[in-house]
Structures are given as C-alpha cells and as structure tokens.
Design a protein with these regions (language model features):
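Switch I (G2) and immediately adjacent beta-strands of P-loop GTPase domains
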Residues: 56
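Exposed, interaction-prone extracellular/peripheral surfaces
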Residues: 1-29, 44-50, 59, 68, ...
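DNA target-recognition patches
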Residues: 53
C-alpha cells in the first residue's frame, strides 16, 4: 500500500506545498515555535507520544493523573484523524480501507509538514490514540500505526466521536464510508448531532467518505441474499432497474447531506 509510488506522490505534494509557501510567506495562520522559555499557558492531559520530560510531576503527585505543561509559543494546532476500522471498510474489489488508510496518511503528512500535532484514533481503540508532532520526521510513526490497524466488527460514529479525548481547538477529520444503520435511519439528525458536537468542542469537522465502485454503481439483477458485513444480518431483495435507481438516489442524497452539513456553520 505504502509503496514507492505513494512516497513519490508525497514528495510532489511536499514540493507543491513549498512552492505555495514561497509565494505567500505570511501564510494563512500564525506560525508556532516551541520553547520552554515561553510564557506558561495551560495544562493538558498526557497522550501517548508526548514528551515525558514535559510532565508536571507536582500535578501528578496531587491528582495521580499525568498532565503536560503547555506554553504560549508551543501551543500547536491539533489535527485529529478518526479512522473507521469496521468490517464494512473491507468491502469492494479495491478495498475501502486501503483508500481510507492512504487518506489518513496524506492528511497526517500535510499536518506534520505544517508543524501541527497529529492525533490518530481508530474506532476500535478510541482510548488509545497516537499523538505525534515535531514535523515530517515523525511521519514514519504514522505509517507504522496505520500499517498495524485491523478492520472488523461494528462501529458507531456518533458515539465514537464523543468518546475521543480532545485537547482543545483543532480540526477533526473523520474517514469512513458513513454507511451505518443509525446514520441511514435518521441521517439528518445523526449527522447534525455529530457536527454540532464537534463544533461545540471547537473542532472544525472534515468528513472524508470512502466508497467503492460496487457501492456507487450497482451491477446486479434478480433476487439476491445480502449479508451485512458488520452484523451478519441477512436481507433478501429483488434488484431491478427501479430498485437500483432508488438505492443510488438515496446514496447520493446521504452524501449530499453530509457535504452540506460540513459546509454550513
């Protein structure tokens, strides 16, 4: 998956980013510089990947919990990436999880190149995020984490988003097929709740939907037994032109609602 072609693409992306930076030296957001001499700003809870040298041992002694000291000059922008690792991501001739994993890598690479801190979470291990910073030199840790993900079982995005430990304002990138029963049954409300929650937590939501060709264009006719990859529930359906048209109409309506929800607010 992460072959020479992928790294060549990243190299081209890096050159394009450097070219854009040279054309607009001021940038679109404030640059951050790390330094222990800066003015103290706040505490935040320790996350795997943080520098243990920055633990506040006095706080640990009082509360028996690990907190990191942050300073005004070293407060990084946070980019949290939630990767859907449910069984449905294994569907398709070209597996959806392959594209999802590559998207996660690209987003992480761009964030690290911007000197942001990247927090990687998967839906199966919400309380075990990987937090990396320090620029592109930390990218191999991202690749190692992504290569060790396993896909299977069920996930529920709304509850997953609410369980992720967030450290402050930032960007939340959710990578999923978004084909989950709660979202499909009451899609408008579910998406609205998820997006409202993220904005309440001062996160700018970015939803990246990964679908395979077999889902976008149904190529089957007659009566079929369909099996849910996550729950193994079975459904007997008769596929004809009218049923396929209704399916595709609902699928693109679902995608449209998600896109509209992210664009608003």
């Amino acid at each position: 998956m992460f072959d020479s072609e992928f790294y060549n693409t990243l190299s081209q992306l890096s050159l394009a980013m450097a070219h854009k930076s040279n054309r607009n030296m001021s940038g679109n957001r404030k640059s951050v510089q790390k330094g222990v001499s800066a003015e103290f700003s706040d505490f935040r809870e320790y996350m795997p990947g943080d520098d243990l040298r920055r633990l506040d041992w006095n706080v640990y002694a009082r509360l028996n919990r690990m907190y990191i000291r942050e300073y005004m000059e070293e407060k990084e922008a946070y980019v949290t990436i939630l990767l859907d690792t449910s069984a449905s991501m294994e569907y398709g001739e070209h597996k959806k999880y392959e594209l999802a994993t590559m998207l996660a890598a690209v987003v992480a690479y761009i964030a690290l190149a911007n000197m942001d801190r990247v927090v990687l979470v998967d839906t199966a291990e919400l309380m075990r995020p990987l937090s990396v910073g320090g620029g592109k030199k930390s990218f191999p840790r991202v690749i190692h984490w992504l290569e060790n993900r396993t896909f299977g079982g069920e996930s529920e995005l709304l509850s997953s988003v609410r369980k992720i430990p967030l450290t402050g304002a930032g960007v939340m990138v959710v990578i999923s097929d978004f084909l989950q029963e709660p979202l499909l049954e009451e899609a408008d409300r579910s998406y609205e709740k998820m997006l409202q929650y993220l904005r309440y937590r001062k996160q700018r939501p970015v939803m990246l939907q990964t679908l395979c060709g077999e889902e976008l264009h149904i190529d089957m006719e007659g009566t079929r037994n369909l099996i849910d990859m996550e729950t193994e529930d079975k459904l007997r359906v008769t596929m004809d032109a009218q049923a396929i048209e209704a399916y595709e109409k609902e699928l693109f309506a679902l995608t449209g609602r998600l896109k509209k929800g992210c664009a608003s607010g």
